[in-house]
Amino acid sequence: MFKLELQTRRNFLTATTLGLTFTGIASAQTAPTTIRIPIAPRRQWDERNGYCGECSIQQAALYFGTYVSQYVCRAIINTNQQSQLLVAVNAQKVLTALKLNSTEFNYNGYASPQFQTYFGWVKQHLKLLHPVLITAFVKGLSDPDYDHIMLATGITASNFTTYNSTDQLYFNDFFSSQVSLRTASTLNDIRSMLINGAKYPFCIPTKICYGCAVLGIQDISARALPVSITLGNWTEPNVIAGVAPSTLSASVSVNGLVVGKSYSLFRYNDYRKVSTANYTASAYSTIRNFVASGTWPTSLKTSYPMA
């Protein structure tokens, strides 16, 4: 985990173990606009009912400067790895433990069918560059609520307030190394999966919808700058399947730097030690002090081994 502070934000790497209130945001536009959050797809582990929720949070956390393995994500809620990470059940508990703010779709606050209202909610968060954990039915499965969790990372739309059948949603499904793209009218179905589900493997429930938007890091100091992490491989050693842990490589990017100003980049090797203020007095693992120069006037990129 990394934080770089203006002499800061956080950059969190924990690889050793391998909100916003929904108020409506009007932004009518005459031509479609595309907003993409640069989050690369990652492969989920399939064992023990699947690690899709853990993989969702892992990807969103990377965008905000935090790396945790899928194992660590699940261990936050269940140390024996038997309980799933689920939206509307325990996803926010994990995000809070990682010092990330989040908000969930209020599925109790809207009449059924909810899909169009839900899709408008997702659009509003994507406009604010908040990745969204979305839930889906999977053809051939039978859970009445949802079977799978994915991460919405972008939208093409002419407005960012309400549903439009021609909108396009970008999302990571955790099985493909490529970002998926679907038109809004093809995204939803009921449990039988006989309409859109006849063509597509994943569909958002039409009637009752569940989602969780990740808003960003907890930063009481209000001094942290945007840090993101990119991993060198889209998979990680599946220790649940008996694969031995290995060292991962990561690139850390910091944006919003001002030439001539001093900064400190903090690394935390344990998510439980990440601070939300007074970073210089926190239990960080390493610190890198630097002055922004013309070499990287607005951003810093560096690499770290992650064991």
Language-model features and meaning:
Residues 1-7, 11, 15-22, 26:
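N-terminal secretory signal peptides
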Residues 30-39, 71-221:
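Conserved active-site-adjacent core of cysteine acyl-enzyme catalytic domains
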Residues 35-80:
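Active-site nucleophile-adjacent alpha helix/oxyanion-hole segment immediately C-terminal to the catalytic cysteine
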Residues 214-243:
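Short, compositionally biased P/S/T/A/G/V-rich stretches that sit at domain boundaries
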Residues 246-252:
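Structural beta-strand segments of beta-rich domains
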Residues 257-261:
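Short proline/glycine-enriched turn/loop motifs at strand-loop junctions of beta-rich domains
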Residues 264-266:
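Beta-strand signatures of extracellular beta-sandwich domains
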Residues 286-307:
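C-terminal beta-strand-rich structural cap/linker in extracellular carbohydrate-active enzymes
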